[in-house]
Amino acid sequence: MWKLKIGEGGAGLISVNNFIGRQHWEFDPNAGTPQEHAEIERLRREFTKNRFSIKQSADLLMRMQLRKENHYGTNNNIPAAVKLSDAENITVEALVTTITRAISFYSSIQAHDGHWPAESAGPLFFLQPLVMALYITGSLDDVLGPEHKKEIVRYLYNHQNEDGGWGFHIEGHSTMFGSALSYVALRILGEGPQDKAMAKGRKWILDHGGLVAIPSWGKFWVTVLGAYEWSGCNPLPPELWLLPKFAPFHPGKMLCYCRLVYMPMSYLYGKKFVGPITALIRSLREELYNEPYNQINWNTARNTVAKEDLYYPHPLIQDMLWGFLYHVGERFLNCWPFSMLRRKALEIAINHVHYEDENSRYLCIGSVEKVLCLIARWVEDPNSEAYKLHLARIPDYFWLAEDGLKIQSFGCQMWDAAFAIQAILACNVSEEYGPTLRKAHHFVKASQVRENPSGDFNAMYRHISKGAWTFSMHDHGWQVSDCTAEGLKAALLLSEMPSELVGGKMETERFYDAVNVILSLQSSNGGFPAWEPQKAYRWLEKFNPTEFFEDTMIEREYVECTGSAMQGLALFRKQFPQHRSKEIDRCIAKAIRYIENMQNPDGSWYGCWGICYTYGTWFAVEGLTACGKNCHNSLSLRKACQFLLSKQLPNAGWGESYLSSQNKVYTNLEGNRANLVQSSWALLSLTHAGQAEIDPTPIHRGMKLLINSQMEDGDFPQQEITGVFMRNCTLNYSSYRNIFPIWAMGEYRRQVLCAHSY
């Protein structure tokens, strides 16, 4: 039976806070009772049976384990679920009962170190490169035991579409990228070309052009594997590292995720590394092409991409650049004396990989970069200690649920905890849930980054991180503006609570450090980027080499990050009015202008990290209201309310499809279904913007939907994915279904039900 381990170290692991926040799964053949084994198998069968209609796992294995460990059984004395008829009004008693049941359930799945473990997955390109990398390096059986392989195979088959292909993400239509990577991974894991649905998957691949039609990232991976040729890839020249730092194309100006992908990719490209050509690789060369491998025109293949994958087509100027580098640049750089430049560039590239590894404790910024850095370190020295340290951190990325074993983007431990604290505090029930808040407070304090990156971090194109919070945990090390702001808010709110209830508050200097990070990130237009100050020209996006992402080349400002920063600074200003007051006032004023300028004519804001207009509008409204705006003095807020009211469904909820993010047009979920997370965002926005002062009826109706949707155990149902990134890929946050209904109910009780009668 699989067990989730919390806060545990092990051989080859390094931590700066004793592994607080670490979560990883291990298989224990002796764990569990026969009844638990039977229940787990039932949950797996249910998911597989419904996999085409319900594509997101509900994180049921983790929830089952933690409820047992926290001694919450089926006989716990919780009130019965409230169900209100259309004719009934919401009463304080009904609302408090629902809140109590919701927080009781959510407290029962809190880890002992204070965070709430949860899935953060959904893309169908995180897992397969790891399988390929471990196969290339010969470490597959060392890292993946029989149970790992069994659950990975389960996951990939569970998320195969009815047409035989696999999507870019689990809710998406079939793509060559997802299909080819998944097919290859299954073959590596021992599935035969005719096993189960493999033949159907291969048919989809061949019917859509074969492996030559895989996008650029896929071409890179199957080349490194040996099932494709470097001559069929557009160049990834490491020589960009040799450009002067002021050059617009210098990697130091890239978005950190782009830079950290390019570092190891350029190293492997410059080495023209290819893994061992085994019998399996030779078989893949026959299985996945529509013509003999030795007759493929690799130059033509460079820019061949299946139409199903083509979200961001290359502009002509980009193809001209790749053509020049391919036909001219590579010839020069592989001949003496120009080859000396390549050797120098490779040295710089791998040194940057070293720096990222060491400063992230071999976690790296995310799963895509992790696998690339791992294989780069193996190519550099297969017997190195660094490679062993990389292997030791792989389990940090595993997540297991009823649909199988998957790889997370990384983890959302801190992000979820900061929201959860605010949600519980909004309900005014802190006395009853003091132990929950105390543990969460401990986690927040232990997760703040206490130091900047090592050495001359500016020379390594890193920004300050002392005082920040990461998306996940301290060991990760990467500062994020909105995570820092939400962490600051949570810590400030808890500092106002009695220490005997929630524990001692953070030292004042640590609040100051957090504010320093936030202020350092604001752009000249008033907006806030996510990780680092904006430092590149927007036209560089013309050279985005991926065909399936948008806005991936440079750091940019986000409505969500700006809204969070405004809230954090506004709350800090109330508690510490003398600290950098003029700077904070100017910062907030500029941020307000940015938010107002980014509003769409229909009153909405586009959200880049959640789906989509509902999400962006929530952050914008929260930012404006935290800084003194309301429906009486802000046209932006009145327009926001009008927008949200126009999208309320006949069932009183809101439900927005991921297609909104892709197409940049608000799109309802199929069948006009309501999504409880998005409904909660809309209700929070309307509540804080002051809609209840105009007409509270839409809020009452939406709140009744939340109350009636609660499950018997106090949980809320898992519905459609609500996270997104780079406009075209979804990400599931399984804790959102608990956090945001709790938060919306708490604010409704305080600001609507107790202030505005029916």
Swiss-Prot record:
**Key words, A-Z:** Isomerase, Repeat
Q: Which GO CC annotations does the UniProt entry carry? A: lipid droplet
Q: What is the annotated tissue distribution of the protein whose record heads this document?
A: Expressed in root nodules.
Keyword Lipoprotein set for record: no
Reaction equations catalysed:
(S)-2,3-epoxysqualene = lupeol
- Whether Transcription regulation counts among this entry's keywords is no
- Tell me one GO biological process term: pentacyclic triterpenoid biosynthetic process
Instruction: Enumerate the SUPFAM superfamilies for this protein.
Output: Terpenoid cyclases/Protein prenyltransferases
| E.C. no | 5.4.99.41
Cite the GO molecular-function annotations of the record.
lupeol synthase activity
Q: What induces it?
A: Down-regulated by methyl jasmonate (MeJA). No effect of gibberellin A3 (GA3).
CDD domains, from UniProt? SQCY_1 (cd02892)
List S-S links within the chain.
none
Question: Which residues are catalytic?
Answer: 482
**Class of enzymatic activity (EC top level):** isomerase
What's this protein's function? Answer: Oxidosqualene cyclase involved in the biosynthesis of lupeol. Required for the production of betulinic acid.
Q: Which family does it belong to?
A: Belongs to the terpene cyclase/mutase family.
The name this protein carries in UniProt is: Lupeol synthase
Organism whose genome encodes this protein:
Glycyrrhiza glabra (Licorice)
Q: What is the lineage of its organism?
A: Eukaryota, Viridiplantae, Streptophyta, Embryophyta, Tracheophyta
Q: Which gene encodes it?
A: LUS1
